[in-house]
C-alpha cells in the first residue's frame, strides 16, 4: 500500500529542492529524516514536513508500520512563477522570477526479500 503527501506552490526554486530530494529518494524513512535534519539547505525543513505528513498518512489511513516504510517516489515539479521587477539604472527594469515548487513524496512498505 502506498501513502502520499504533496505540498503545492511552496516558495522554493525546484532546482534547489531537487538537490535535497535526490538525497532521500529510495531510503528508509528514519534514515531520510536524519539526513534532512543534518542537511544545511533551505529546502530541508520543507521536505521534512512533507515526509512526516506522508508517514502520518501511512499510519493513519492505511495502518502501516512507520519503521517498515521506504520512500518509493520523491519528486519536485515546477509550480507557478511569481514575476517581479527590479529597478535598474536609467529608468530600466529587470525581470525577477520567483519560482515555486510542487513537492510530492510517496512511501510504501519495504518489500520482503
Curated annotation (Swiss-Prot):
Q: Give yes or no: UniProt keyword Ribosomal protein.
A: yes
Which residues form each disulfide bond in the chain?
Answer: none
Q: Which Pfam families match?
A: Ribosomal_L22
**InterPro entries linked:** Ribosomal_uL22 (IPR001063), Ribosomal_uL22_bac/chlpt-type (IPR005727), Ribosomal_uL22_bac/org-type (IPR047867), Ribosomal_uL22_CS (IPR018260), Ribosomal_uL22_sf (IPR036394)
Any one Gene Ontology cellular component term annotated for this protein? cytosolic large ribosomal subunit
Transmembrane annotation, as ranges: none
Q: Which PANTHER family match?
A: CHLOROPLAST 50S RIBOSOMAL PROTEIN L22-RELATED (PTHR13501), LARGE RIBOSOMAL SUBUNIT PROTEIN UL22M (PTHR13501:SF8)
Family classification: Belongs to the universal ribosomal protein uL22 family.
Q: What is this protein called?
A: Large ribosomal subunit protein uL22
What organism does this protein naturally occur in? Bacillus pumilus (strain SAFR-032)
What gene is behind this protein?
rplV
Amino acid at each position: 500500500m502506498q501513502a502520499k503527501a504533496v505540498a503545492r506552490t511552496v516558495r522554493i526554486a525546484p532546482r534547489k529542492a531537487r538537490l535535497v530530494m535526490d538525497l532521500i529518494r529510495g531510503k528508509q524513512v528514519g534514515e531520510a529524516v536524519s539526513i534532512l535534519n543534518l542537511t544545511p539547505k533551505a529546502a530541508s525543513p520543507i521536505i521534512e514536513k512533507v515526509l512526516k505528513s506522508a508517514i502520518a498518512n501511512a499510519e493513519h489511513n492505511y495502518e502501516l508500520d512507520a519503521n517498515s516504510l521506504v520512500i518509493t517516489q520523491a519528486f519536485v515539479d515546477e509550480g507557478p512563477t511569481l514575476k517581479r521587477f527590479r529597478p535598474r539604472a536609467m529608468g530600466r527594469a529587470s525581470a525577477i522570477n520567483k519560482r515555486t515548487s510542487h513537492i510530492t513524496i510517496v512511501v510504501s512498505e519495504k518489500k520482503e526479500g
